[in-house]
Curated annotation (Swiss-Prot):
The keyword Protein biosynthesis does not apply. Keywords: Bacterial microcompartment, Calvin cycle, Carbon dioxide fixation, Carboxysome, Photorespiration, Photosynthesis. RuBisCO catalyzes two reactions: the carboxylation of D-ribulose 1,5-bisphosphate, the primary event in carbon dioxide fixation, as well as the oxidative fragmentation of the pentose substrate in the photorespiration process. Both reactions occur simultaneously and in competition at the same active site. Although the small subunit is not catalytic it is essential for maximal activity. There are estimated to be 152 RuBisCO holoenzymes per carboxysome. InterPro entries: RuBisCO_ssu, RuBisCO_ssu_dom, RuBisCO_ssu_sf. This is Ribulose bisphosphate carboxylase small subunit. GO terms for cellular component: carboxysome. Belongs to the RuBisCO small chain family. It comes from Prochlorococcus marinus subsp. pastoris (strain CCMP1986 / NIES-2087 / MED4). GO terms for molecular function: ribulose-bisphosphate carboxylase activity. SMART domains: RuBisCO_small.
Amino acid sequence: MPFQSSVGDYQTVATLETFGFLPPMTQEEIYDQIAYIIAQGWSPVIEHVHPSGSMQTYWSYWKLPFFGEKDLNLVVSELEACHRAYPDHHVRIIGYDAYTQSQGTAFAVFQGR
């Protein structure tokens, strides 16, 4: 008897980020994750891309990385500004760890159409 999934066809669903297999985050959970990025001393980086190119191309920076930024409200306002400027794009935030020179975390805040 074949397995019937109530979730859908997991093999064809594109996942954009660290939390891609979990239910969508609430606004409060997104704020908590951004606060975690800042608390770790990672640099918040905002990127965006049109959904048609999200798996084939590099994502574009929104401004420059926010090196040393400690203000959660500023990061959130820049995420919202990026989404207003590109409403049909995916918008994600990356926590860049300069010590290990790698991404500490990355997740989509807004998903495009």
